[in-house]
Amino acid sequence: MYGQMSRPLIVFLLILSVCQSIHYEPNWESLDSRPLPSWYDEAKIGIFLHWGVFSVPSFYSEWFWKRWKDGEPSVVNFMKQNYRPDFTYADFAPMFQTEFYDPNKWADLFQAAGARYVVQVTKHVEGFTSWPSKYSWNWNAMDVGPKRDLVGELASAIRNRTNIHFGVYHCLYEWFNPLFLQDTANKFQTNDFVMRKTLPELYELVNKYEPDLLWSDGDWMGPDWYWNSTIFLAWLYNESPVKDKIIVNDRWGYNTRCKHGGFWDCADKFNPGKLMPHKWEDCMAIDKQSWGYRRTTTVDELYSIKELIALLIEIVSFGGNLLVNVGPTSYGTIAPIFEERLRQMGSWLDVNGDAIYATKPWTYQNDSMTPGVWYTSKAGTSGTEVYAITIKWPSSVLTLADPVVSIDTTVSLLGYSGSVKYKPGVAGGIEIYAPDLNIEDIPCLWAWTFKMTGLKNA
């Protein structure tokens, strides 16, 4: 008995020893060999939060300060009409009060939205940190404005109330930091800004909050060697407190996007429209004009829930994740229209989550005959399960060209307990007879999922 029990223990210890012996070198060949922790691919859906001093003017976009300095007419006129002549951008910071910020409510909302990870902007290009950073004196949320640790509060709420993974966004550069401007003037032959500001902040963020995901940005201003990216990532993977679970993106230098990193997002609102050779993400905003909150937003500038669901389905069918951005207000709330979108998305996922979470792309990503039908798949107890998700409710028959039926094929409609009939298509494929339902009996709105098992080509 002792020998039988000790054998699996020995195997476990050997595996553990091998895992602990892996050491990543500070070069991309070594760093890119690190396997992506499985939770990220299984998660599929995240929430992005752009929140900072730019949320106070809440005009134009989160690039308000830069556009003001660049002389953008709409921003210049806005300032002339509403603020005294000597008003500076720093004067907005004390007005960033976040007085209604309740991280517990936010955490509950994100859970209701069906999100499996959250990425909070901890520092955007304005340089203001949402945590009490030692390296951003008097330009952080504890010293000025809220007088709160906005990052720590949300991290605690997420971890205490949900099963959501907590991530942080950090911008490598800052528009007007004198150290960065001097490095730029020196053509990056110096990196004082990186050594005295960027890297200390990154180490501080990771050690203090132990995030599951680190979303880097602002990389386009310099190459990876200027940012010391590979050295930092080697520490992150080898020595940091999150070395076994952390996931990063590809924004570590203007020469790294779509080439290196844990997952690729390549560009904002990236949708390749095809399978990619690497795990990828589409980060997008419900407000099509801005990542930060705008007081001037109109309904026609927002993603409708049907558009959002259709995008989610398409992205997942191609093997991607969808990171959905909302911009909170300066007083710490999420506007009702954005909350509604998130809750609607969650209600759809309550019915159709099996076709999204932990799925893999199928042989076909969209049907070759019927437009608006997308496929996902996952391993089931009796073989591969294939999900056909249609963004148009079929009036009677849904004809699909790509699934090949067998005598063992079964078809069901997610959220519906009744039987679903089908027959082989005349020219191949399958013809699915949509249940004759009253509108109040249809299991969900916006898109519907037919689950197929026992296909010959699954």
Name each model-derived stretch.
Residues C19-A458:
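Mature catalytic domains of secreted/periplasmic carbohydrate-active enzymes
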Residues S6-S21:
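Cleavable N-terminal signal peptides of Sec/SRP-targeted secreted and luminal proteins
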